[in-house]
Every structure is written in C-alpha cells, then in structure tokens.
Amino acid sequence: MMNRLLVFLMLGAAFMLVVSANDAYGDEPAFKDLNQGDESLGKRKSCCPCWLRGNCFWGQNCYPEGCSGPKV
C-alpha cells in the first residue's frame, strides 16, 4: 500500500515540475500580470501548449511556443 502511495506522489510531483517548467518558459509574464488591463496579455491567458496535442481545456487555443506563439 505504501509503495502505491509513494508512486502516486512521485507522479504528482513530476507532473507539477513539468507544469511549472512550462510556466517559466521564455519571457512569459507571471499569472498575476495576465489579470491586469492589457488586452494582449488577457488573450494570452486562454491558451495552452501544443504538446498537449490540441487537447486544450475550457476552449483554450493551442500555441506551438507557449502563449506567445502563433495560434494553431
């Protein structure tokens, strides 16, 4: 039982590392900056990386290079 729990926790930690590494990619602004009045930043909030193979959630758009790349 402990082995399964440990594997589950390690997979969760690996997933969080991937997500945080993707958030830190390039010169992307912090999430709190996306909620401010700049319209271009607001549009970038609803996007997802294309390594999800287009399986974006909540109607997001897929961008090849983070949120700043051209929409796919």
UniProtKB/Swiss-Prot annotation:
Secreted keyword on record: yes
Q: Molecular function terms in GO for this entry?
A: sodium channel inhibitor activity; toxin activity
Pfam family name, one:
ATX_III
Q: Which UniProt keywords apply?
A: Disulfide bond, Ion channel impairing toxin, Nematocyst, Neurotoxin, Secreted, Signal, Toxin, Voltage-gated sodium channel impairing toxin
| Signal peptide bounds | 1-21
Q: List the disulfide bonds.
A: 47-62, 48-56, 50-67
- Location of the protein in the cell: Secreted; Nematocyst
Family, similarity comment: Belongs to the sea anemone short toxin (type III) family.
Q: What is this protein called?
A: Delta-actitoxin-Avd2b 1
**Organism the protein comes from:** Anemonia viridis (Snakelocks anemone)
